[in-house]
Amino acid sequence: MSYQSMEEAKLRGEKENIPFWKAIQLEDAQERDVKIEDSWEKMKYMWQSMLDALDAYEPDKVSRSGLVGTEGGLMDNYRENEEPLCGDFVSKVMSNALKMGCNNAGMKRIVAAPTAGSCGIIPAVFIAYEQYYKVNEDSIIKALFTASGIGEIV
């Protein structure tokens, strides 16, 4: 994306009277030379890939090295049987992040969002948010555009 600063993206939004996420989507479509609808569908596909990656988690499978794999299941058990200090929502995010990390280490579908080093933090947060707060998919897609724009600028 060609935005060099948050201010630049914000100014486009103000100039065209559109929200921040839409400015990012328009820039994405322009940069990739696709229709706005195609940009939306691509982000929707990425969201579904994140959901699929989390669904693919198997708590009894370990990585080839044997070092990781069960942590997401352990966190789920803790959440169900204890009262996590960080509360239900944050512990759900932690569980999702551990599952994504285990799947990445086990060479399942790799979701490197925002980067491979963060190992699926965006999916972990957004999936927990969708489940916990019962928001619609369009809201998540808009949030993904927002996050991708911020990530690109930073």
Sequence positions of predicted segments:
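Conserved phosphate/anionic-ligand binding catalytic regions in large, soluble enzymes, centered on
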Residues: 107-125
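Generic N-terminal targeting/processing segments that precede catalytic cores or assembly contacts
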Residues: 1-108
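A structural-propensity feature for long, helix-poor, extended segments
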Residues: 145-154
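Short, surface-exposed, charged/polar-biased interaction segments
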Residues: 71-75, 118, 128-131
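Alpha-helical support elements that line or immediately flank enzyme active sites
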Residues: 123-135
